[in-house]
Amino acid sequence: MKPKFYIGLFSILLFFSCKKETSIIVSSKDYHAAVDNVTQIMLHDIFSPPVASRIFVYPNIAAFEVIAQNSTKYNSLQNQLNGLDSIPKLDSKAGVNQKLAALVAHMEVSKQLVFSEEIVEKFRDSLYKKWSDCNEKEFEISKDYGLKVAERIKKWMGKDNYKQTRTFQKYTVSTNIEGRWQPTPPAYMDAIEPHWNKIRTLVLDSASQFKPKPAMPFSLNKNSVFYNQVKEVYDIGNEITKKGESCEEVKIAQFWDCNPYATVNQGHMTFAKKKITPGGHWMGIVKIASQKSNADFEKTVYAYTKTSIGIFESFISCWDEKFRSNVIRPETIINEKMDENWKPLLQTPPFPEYTSGHSVLSTCSAIILNNIFGDNFSFVDDTEIPFGLPKRKFSSFENASKEAAISRFYGGIHYKASIENGIEQGKNIGDFIVSKLKMTK
């Protein structure tokens, strides 16, 4: 009996010994899931597009800082991003699993940025249990380092003026000045984030560094540039209506709508339609590109981080101009001066018209993704499938960005000038980020 007993005891000890020494495997799939989880929370909590860009960028930066420590491929963003001057050093002999620590940092920073913290915690706890069961020692060491980096990023994040802008005065609508923005149907919401240009930039010198060309002067003269641009929106809207809902212009407009403030009226009740933000859509494209290219964990984090930095900067630059020029939306001027029954294909979002946010951030994102994955990277975009829309194929990131930009014209919510100048603005931002940030060695 004794030999059998000792053999059994040895087998048990060997099992637990091997289990303890097994390194925890963290994959790109885990990181995609973490970003997807944040996107889903934003659908639940309904954050504005500018605020959503902030929720995406800081967790990604936290994760990137972890994987950049002692890396032979990536450089820390320390002293590259405004105000980010120190990151806790990583002891290469401490046994830290950097992928695990990166995810810990991402989740910890995410939790502070959303309302539904319990959703982050549920996702986090499921990973923590799996990791702890695999190798508790490695998990605890790695978690501790991830939390240290997260705390440093949260401290830096807290100085970006976001909290201060929550207390600033609401936007005042100037109805006595012709051509100024006014709230639009159906909800007639207040203008969102009128002080977003006060948020600290990450790479840009200031919110106005890439100030676009001045907006068109308001004029109802039928020979004026402004009047003809209004008429162009009116005419394309009527033309699309005649073609019907199955036409390509409708498909393009709906695919890139990305308006978290879209509402549906039923009787006396108003319901919000669940839609991702424009930044959320481009985060989805990062996922698609990373998966198609079989990017490893580190490159996946790098792609999300660099793209989310571009989106964040794009919103600050774009919003700086929106509330400088305060341009009236097509829907308002068409209803007042041309056709009181005309409606745009898409609901008009609640902020001034110039420049087109989709044009700015999509162009910037495409430039950054070209830099990471190469030009002419074809892909199938299935980001909108959960929202009842089909896939769309694109020959390149630039192809997708141009379609995103023109979608706002088809949707009846932007003039051509806003789209064209927004593309130029986004190009300037994207080129600047690519040239200034040295994230790879």
Regions found by a protein language model. Give the residues of each.
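Bacterial Sec-dependent N-terminal signal peptides
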Residues: 1-25
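Acidic/polar surface patches and capping/hinge elements
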Residues: 19-441
